[in-house]
Amino acid sequence: MVIHTCLDEHKTEQFVEDTQRLKLTLKIMDLCRTLPDLDWTVFIVTQHFLKSTELIRKMYTEMTNEERLTLLELILAQLGVVEEQKDCLMPLSAAQFLASCFTDHGRTVLSLSSEASDNQAALVIIWLLDILCEMTSDRKEFMSLQDHPDLLSATVDLLKEIHLLGKNSRNVFTAAHNFTLTRPEGAETHPVLSFKAHLIRLIGNLCHGHVVNQDKVREMDGIALILDNCSIDSNNPFISQWAVFAIRNILEHNLENQKLIQGLRRQGLADDTMLRGMGFRVEERDGSLLLRPLKKDP
């Protein structure tokens, strides 16, 4: 409480320059993890530390992955609180630093496809993605992230790799159609749950009202990639909805992208085995697709 009361903007910046004071910031972060009900440590981080880009950069560099997860969890939680308070959580430059951490190390999450993987390093990427999704959800103070030089291309590339990895072998990135109430142990809490859907969400956010990014997605063959993820996937709830949202943003006021969609050819109905397993079938009538319940045997 005393530290919180004594801190101001100038004193916070001094933590960057002094090794002993930097160790104190890491100790405070450790208390946030081990004693989450201790409000004052959370206040120190959210009301002082997060206001300094250089301190965030320095702390993040010195932290273990476990400590980074605590910091990212606080940032994500505060994004919702700050939205209600109409206050700025952190400077744009700090958000750009987090975006660069995601672009530089995003491929770490691919290690989750193997049994021997560093879950904490991958979890850091997953939390970074969730934060970036929230920051780019029409938050004016962070929408300049749309102009980040590598964020969109890195996100599309990562989606490509994950999509191919899930198709080429059976692993945590493979689409699943298990909608029973009793799913395999750990399926509902696996860290990769919804990761692919959130990649598509971020792409949609970055393309909203941004012609340059819309064109970039087309040039990277990202439109077909997103369309290929419109199927229902129990490992990625709402992925089809995020895909539709992303396509809408990619096509908005973009004639070239609209022409690409118009040039697609219909190749018949997709495999509806999964729908039939849920008691439904797809019926084509007058150029439209209808969802019908399966007829029960008498």
What are these language model-derived features?
Residues M1-P298:
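Extended alpha-helical scaffold regions
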